[in-house]
Amino acid sequence: MAHKKAAGSSRNGRDSESKRLGVKLFGGQAATAGNIIVRQRGTKFHAGSGVGIGKDHTLFALNDGVIKFETKGPKNRKFVSVVSA
């Protein structure tokens, strides 16, 4: 007969690795072509002039300039553009 009660096993202890999403360059900061501006899931921020969008919705600078954030349109969408300095 067992003199020790069987130990339970936990079903917790898993968590996904953080994806380091968010704004990488803020309004007024200088950007060079190819710089990542925003890493995001979906289009929380939309690409304005001088900004490209990757297949994972990452926004990046297409040319050198200064970052500008603005809201436009009837749905108040957030746009990011690169304005030449």
From Swiss-Prot:
Gene behind the chain? rpmA
Lineage, please? Bacteria, Pseudomonadati, Pseudomonadota, Gammaproteobacteria, Oceanospirillales
One Pfam family this sequence matches: Ribosomal_L27
- One of this protein's GO BP terms? translation
- Region Disordered: which residues? 1-21
Tell me the InterPro entries matching this sequence. Answer: Ribosomal_bL27, Ribosomal_bL27_CS
User: Mind telling me which GO cellular component terms the entry cites?
Assistant: cytosolic large ribosomal subunit
Query: Which keywords has UniProt assigned to this entry?
Result: Ribonucleoprotein, Ribosomal protein
UniProt family annotation: Belongs to the bacterial ribosomal protein bL27 family.
Judging by the UniProt lineage, the source's domain of life is Bacteria
Which Gene3D superfamilies does the entry link to? 2.40.50.100
The Gene Ontology terms for molecular function here are: structural constituent of ribosome
UniProt-recorded name of the protein? Large ribosomal subunit protein bL27
Q: Which organism is it from?
A: Chromohalobacter salexigens (strain ATCC BAA-138 / DSM 3043 / CIP 106854 / NCIMB 13768 / 1H11)
